[in-house]
From Swiss-Prot:
Catalytic component of the exosome, which is a complex involved in RNA degradation. Has 3'->5' exoribonuclease activity. Can also synthesize heteromeric RNA-tails. The keyword Hydrolase applies. Residues 244-264, 291-493 are annotated as: Disordered. PANTHER family: EXOSOME COMPLEX COMPONENT, EXOSOME COMPLEX COMPONENT RRP41. The gene is rrp41. Residues 297-377, 401-471 have a biased composition (Acidic residues). It comes from Methanosarcina mazei (strain ATCC BAA-159 / DSM 3647 / Goe1 / Go1 / JCM 11833 / OCM 88). This is Exosome complex component Rrp41. Residues 249-259, 383-400, 472-493 have a biased composition (Basic and acidic residues). It is an enzyme of class 3 (hydrolase). GO terms for biological process: gene expression; rRNA catabolic process. Belongs to the RNase PH family. Rrp41 subfamily.
């Protein structure tokens, strides 16, 4: 809200506003139902200089799938202002204001739409502002309510919306463009036909008493709007009852004229400024043809094309969002997959190594079996090779003994040296014994008669030695010199 020029008077001393209305009056409203053939429900609304077109699609399958709800339908409300709707060209596409209005308008309809009857579906409401003149959000809500009813969406009741504001210190109903620009406050409200408020906003400063006064005006204005909405819907969906009788054609025509509902409730008189111009009385049929030829054809094709383009753009945006979401999900999945791949590669490497070792062992065993089979075959063909096997076994034993000796070499070297010394001593003793034996043999040959005497002497010596052995104490035994035993044996011989 900007500063008001000094020479601008919004309310006169008589209580009239710039457009000739009183403080508690709404602007004239005109509603057309079913203006879009491709939409499930549609409405064209003119409220003052506001021109709103609404199309409703659904219930239909919700895309993307992740936006579905298992217990109810998803309500999607899209408010958009055409670039030619204001004096300064509006930037096409969604803005912060349009997003905010879409959100609050959707929340205004959620309490009355029976979304639980259509789970996993979507109800799309597309609002296109063709010409803006203050109060576009309230006008869009009124038109959307009619379009939902035209689409056959189950609702607990119609939604009506109106706004009040503060202008020159006075509370007025349904602000126009100048009052909205230079007024002190703006207070839009939406409510059900039972008086339950579903939307309430405020821009500016108001006291509690002013709010109470304004809400009373809003209730009055919403009641008038509800009557217009009901009259328009009744006019479309009610069919005149034709009585079958033998009446004349003029009388039947008169009955039809009586049965047709009056459109006065749907089309309110125009503003005083426009009423000053001379009016030409025309019939209702001509008026309907004029409206169909001037208003609807001028906008229907263009608006349908614009709505289709916007739908395509919104679908493309949704597809791009889905792709981005899928890419993010794939990236998130790729990180653990990389770790898993590394772990799998390590596990596979270990398994491959084990498999290679097993294969090598199997190949070695197969080669050994083949060699054994070849040897067995050769043995069957040539029994002489059995000796070769025995020789191989002996050689293996000798190899094993050699390996054992090599392991014991450091310890056995000393033992071998000692054994060699003992062998040398034994050889010396053996040589000396041989010499003694030779000498004894010569002596025996020379003195055979003396043998008996020596035997007797030896027996006596043995008898003397035996008691000595018995006298030996302890566990130790007396070992005799083998050299003596040899000499004694030789003597015995």
């Amino acid at each position: 809200m900007s500063n008001k020029p000094e020479n601008l008077t919004l309310i006169t001393d008589d209580g009239l506003r710039l457009d000739g209305r009183r403080a508690d009056e709404i602007r004239p409203m005109k509603i057309e139902v079913g203006v879009l053939s491709r939409a499930d429900g549609s409405c064209y609304l003119e409220w003052g200089r506001n021109k709103i077109l609404v199309g409703v699609f659904g219930p239909r399958e919700a895309h993307p799938r992740r936006s579905q709800r298992a217990d109810s339908a998803v309500i999607r409300y899209r408010y958009n202002m055409a670039s030619f709707s204001v004096e300064d060209r509006a930037r096409p596409g969604p803005s912060r204001r349009s997003i905010e209005i879409s959100k609050v308008s959707r929340e205004a309809f959620e309490p009355v739409i029976m979304a639980e009857l259509f789970p996993k579906t979507a109800i799309d409401i597309f609002v296109e502002v063709l010409q803006a003149d203050a109060g576009t959000r309230t006008a869009a809500i009124n038109a959307s309510s009619i379009a939902l009813a035209d689409a056959g969406i189950p609702m607990k009741g119609l939604i009506t919306s109106c706004a009040f504001g503060k202008v020159d210190g006075k509370i007025v109903l349904d602000l126009n463009k100048e009052e909205d620009n230079y007024g002190e406050a703006d207070f839009p409200v939406a409510m059900t036909q039972d008086g339950e408020i579903t939307l309430i906003q405020m821009d500016g400063n108001l006291t509690p008493d002013e709010i109470k006064q304004g809400l009373e005006l809003v209730k009055k204005g919403c009641k008038e709007i509800l009557e217009i909405q009901q009259a328009v819907l009744r006019k479309k969906f009610e069919t005149p009852v034709e009585e079958v009788s033998e009446e004349t054609a003029p009388e039947k025509g008169a009955e039809k004229e009586v049965l047709e509902p009056s459109p006065v409730a749907a089309i309110v008189e125009e503003t005083p400024e426009e009423a000053e111009e001379p009016e030409v009385e025309i019939s209702e049929e001509v008026e309907a043809e004029i409206l169909a030829s001037e208003v609807i054809p001028d906008f229907e094709d263009e608006l349908e094309e614009e709505i289709e383009e916007e739908l395509e753009e919104s679908e493309e945006d949704l597809e791009t969002e889905e792709e981005e979401f899928e890419e993010e999900a794939l990236e998130e999945e790729a990180e653990p997959e990389e770790d898993l791949e590394e772990d799998l590669e390590e596990d596979l490497g270990e398994e491959l190594e084990e498999e290679e070792e097993e294969l090598e062992e199997e190949e070695f065993e197969e080669e050994a079996l083949e060699e054994e089979t070849e040897l067995e075959a050769s043995l069957e063909c040539a029994p002489e090779l059995k000796e070769f096997d025995e020789i191989e076994a002996r050689l293996e034993k000798e190899d094993a003994s050699i390996e054992a000796e090599e392991e014991i070499e450091p310890e056995a070297e000393e033992a071998t040296e000692e054994g060699l010394e003992e062998e040398a001593e034994i050889e010396e003793t053996a040589a000396s014994e041989e010499e003694n034996i030779e000498a004894e043999a010569e002596a025996e040959e020379e003195a055979e008669p003396e043998v008996e005497a020596e035997e007797i002497s030896t027996e006596a010596e043995e008898a003397e030695e035996e008691p000595e052995e018995e006298k030996s104490e302890g566990p130790w035994k007396v070992v005799k010199d083998p050299s003596e035993a040899g000499t004694r044996g030789e003597k015995d011989e």
